[in-house]
Amino acid sequence: MEVNGEIYRVAGPVVTVIGIKPRMYDVVKVGHEGLMGEVIRIKGEQATVQVYEDTSGLKPGEPVMNTGLPLSVELGPGLLESIYDGIQRPLPVLQEKMGNFIQRGVTANGLDRERVWEFKPTVSKGDEVKGGNILGLVQETKNIEHKIMVPPSISGTIKEIKAGSFKVDETICVLTDGTEISMMQKWPVRGPRPVAKKLMPTKPLITGQRILDGMFPIAKGGTAAIPGPFGSGKTVTQQQLAKWSDTDIVVYIGCGERGNEMADVLNEFPELEDPKTGRPLMERTVLIANTSNMPVAAREASVYTGITIAEYYRDMGYDVSLMADSSSRWAEAMREISSRLEEMPGEEGYPAYLSARLSEFYERAGAVNSLAGLDGSITVIGAVSPPGGDFSEPVTQNTLRIVKVFWALDAKLSQRRHFPSINWLTSYSLYTQGLADWYSENVGADWTQLRDDAMDLLQQESELQEIVQLVGSDALPEDQQLTLEVARMVREYFLQQNAFHPVDTYCPFDKQYKLLKSITRYGELATAALESGVPMNKIITIKSKDELAKVKFEENFDAALDVVMKKMDEEFAQIGGN
């Protein structure tokens, strides 16, 4: 190991070194074991390094080597179905090398150098190519065609292009200036990949979760935050989104959360089928596991590694969704590193640059036209874990300033066993208006009206609840009693959803539309019956109303709903409502 510097001081994950003359964010190898670290501050001859591995046992005087390169990820075929740690070391490879517990100083390539891929060129000798252009295709999984692109900084005329089976680091293309291009490229994680232009998000991300799709939709290329106290369902909601959202690629970052949550994902995803393709969900997924017992500094790296991989697939024209669970743990890591650096603390001890770092991350989301002329998107959904469910704390507040969708999880709802426990009164989506045209064309012309009516009902219910708690619902006029009843149906029949039920876990948009329309239909029939003098107790005791609650669990939903709605019309006719 070439020694060109040494350790001066060690303070937890922060190490001060002298004699290496680095640039900001250069990767350095620290100590005799060559622990990986990144330069985060330079002051005179001293450089401060955050180390991405455990620093126990390091001492002043140990050697430090500067690689001269920024922290980069390897991009190419073989990313899908992988599970990495925060600095893109494949965990299965590390397990083979050293067993179930990660030891220090072990390196592993992000992409398998021995695996062979079949490359089919789409360009010819003599063609002009520039950064981002597609050279050829590799079938990475059964449904994902991996487009091999020219690295963004390279352009020229093709002198030679090969076809056949190659390893990722073998040359597949040579330009006239002698530049060799392989299937693999490296990209520094802190810099966003270039695009031709950013686009307005116009299509919704269909998640199969009724409260998200129906009430608070997110667009493909949008940003969302899921804040909530412990046990309110953040991780289950994130996993539901990773399982069922209609994107091509999912990048799931477990950032500082429990290890058994990542184990759940690893156990479930290979067995679950993608509703679009019928293939195992793992085939479209990249997992980055940086659990709470791993070094805190690597949490920052894991977030940047994940978004860079997402950008790479976006540049191929794919829709990517990225789940970060949880950005609060990353912010806590920033706070710890900042305090070790003795920086002036901001609100609640977080560094003053917390907002800048969060926006830097979320701004890498978006719908774009790539350098290859293809439309792709990254949808970023970040969980936030405010201590005690306090939404006024800095991480939640700074995140809310950046994102356009706010899914507020409520501990009271989760205690009442209402899941997903997203509070419909405090949540919001700023994409609703922009997506209205899409809903009119693809779902139903009356969808927006149905949604607005349901939200009005829930708002009225919340206002009436204050009176009900004082005097009871029987003291209300009958029309207000009916409002409470229909609002309860919207809550229990539509908003509640069982993530562990084989049918109800995923609800297609067509089914959501029909279910909400049937509840609205009951409200219309009941109002007409009430106005024609039918007593309230007869209206709320009809059997078809209770049967409507069970329809969403039926595999043959359309047939079951038709039977219930026909019965409802008959029952209202019998009691004199029609």
Curated annotation (Swiss-Prot):
Pfam families: ATP-synt_ab, ATP-synt_ab_N, ATP-synt_ab_Xtn, ATP-synt_VA_C. It is a peripheral membrane protein. Keywords: ATP synthesis, ATP-binding, Cell membrane, Hydrogen ion transport, Ion transport, Membrane, Nucleotide-binding, Translocase, Transport. Its EC number is 7.1.2.2. One of its GO terms (biological process) is proton motive force-driven plasma membrane ATP synthesis. It catalyses: ATP + H2O + 4 H(+)(in) = ADP + phosphate + 5 H(+)(out). Component of the A-type ATP synthase that produces ATP from ADP in the presence of a proton gradient across the membrane. The A chain is the catalytic subunit. This is A-type ATP synthase subunit A. It comes from Methanococcoides burtonii (strain DSM 6242 / NBRC 107633 / OCM 468 / ACE-M). The lineage of its organism: Archaea, Methanobacteriati, Methanobacteriota, Stenosarchaea group, Methanomicrobia.
